[in-house]
Amino acid sequence: MANDVSGLGPTAFVRLLAFHLIGLFVSITVYRLFFHNLSGFRGPFIARLSSFYLAWLSAKRLHLHDEIDDLHSLYGDYVRTGPRELSIIDPQCVQVIYGSQTKCIKGPIYTLLDPRTNLSSTRDKTEHAKRRRAWDRGFSTTALHTYEPMVQELTEELMTIIDELSENPINITEWVDKYAFEVMGQLTFGKPFNMLKERKEAYFLELIRQDMNAIGYLLNLPWLSYLFLRTPGLNQNHLNFWRWIENEFAQRIARGQRRPDVFNWLHQAYLQGPQTKSDTLKLHGDGYLVIVAGSDTTASTITHLLFYLACNKALTQKLQAQLDALEGLTDESLRDVELLDACINETLRLRPAVPAGVQRETPKEGIYIGNRYIPGDTIVKVPMYTLFRDPRSFEQPNEFIPERFTTRPELVKDKSVFIPFLTGSYACVGRRLALMEVRRAVAAILCRYDIALAPGQNEEGFLDGKIDAFTLVAAPLSLKFTRRHQQKQ
């Protein structure tokens, strides 16, 4: 038989190979369409065959959450979005998939940054719990108290820029981005990058944006993302960013701690371990996580909240009155302003930080959501954008009504689905710092200025201009700032 095969001519060999590939393709197609354990779930025909469908939806405009929302309108609570992937908005799914007792683990998408595995991309639950301890110390109440002076200083720098530019409309998105990245940059590397003070864009901010946009296009094809991030020439920006992080960490260690920062806690945990090459790469990965997860999401929330307030004068005046009554703008005093937190929550409901949801993988035995069985080894995602606008959970779901979280609780039918910072053991560790930044920035602006959309700033244009690059990135927002008589420092 071996002699027969070796005696094949080139043409015969190509034909044999073609028949083999065609047979393989047909068998995979038939299996995925009719015999796969997800064949009973509805969804686009092409999605059943290939993950390229989901990647195509994302790449069209980087509005994946809008595309997923449309699919749920067509197919219902469960949509098959890939050969072994489901998008789910059944209200019962939240605790089953993300809760503290979930049997699901993080999906394969979290391997993209290996071997620079950060806390968020750690799939093993035991290792995640071990690494989480250092992060919990770095974001504890005591630690946050030490970060507050730095946040206040940067808030004042943001206000100085608004003071100087307020005679004309201001693209507030640009300056809020710099504000959020400056905070996390200083907490990660223990030094100022002076993006606000010197009116400049730091090198790392440009690299992050380029990297995140690339990830937004390739995120739903992990194997292609893996190749892209490891192919010379294509991965140059990615490699430049990691070299920059390595250099900044080396400088931070050489300088020592000058003021409280998150890195100190992560580095202490690193020093208590074997300090292997793998540990060092994971420390670099954690630096990436602090900057990206703590910046994009916070900046987007601040910008979108300012947009909603600029469109709602009566609500803004009511909030300003409550802020004016405070003796000072401290983190402690701002936490007590219920309407401010309600506005933040409503912004996160309408514009969640990760709108298309985060990926999980079901255990081999599968899971039940109510009476619906989800087979094992299935990738599942809960699109927060759609879930948070579900009329089964929220009255007037597409309207910005912060009072649903204060004086009008009847507008919230099922509060268990609202998890803007996730829930369970994987809940956002930096939640309280993010809220401190948002409260500080928004309160400082409203105490000093009345805000309105600038002439020519279109509401729909702003909302439609956002980018879904896994995290939500706000479009440019032009606001008019008018100085108030009442001011609070």
From Swiss-Prot:
N-terminal signal peptide: none
Residues spanning the membrane: 13-35
Tagged with keyword Oxidoreductase: yes
Glycan attachment residues as annotated in the record: N37, N118, N171, N345
Membrane topology type: Single-pass membrane protein
Gene Ontology terms describing biological process: mycotoxin biosynthetic process
Keywords: Glycoprotein, Iron, Membrane, Metal-binding, Monooxygenase, Oxidoreductase, Transmembrane, Transmembrane helix
Protein purpose: Cytochrome P450 monooxygenase; part of the gene cluster that mediates the biosynthesis of brefeldin A (BFA), a protein transport inhibitor that shows antiviral, antifungal, and antitumor properties. The proposed biosynthesis of BFA involves formation of an acyclic polyketide chain that is differentially tailored throughout the backbone.
Name under which the protein is recorded: Cytochrome P450 monooxygenase orf5
Organism: Eupenicillium brefeldianum
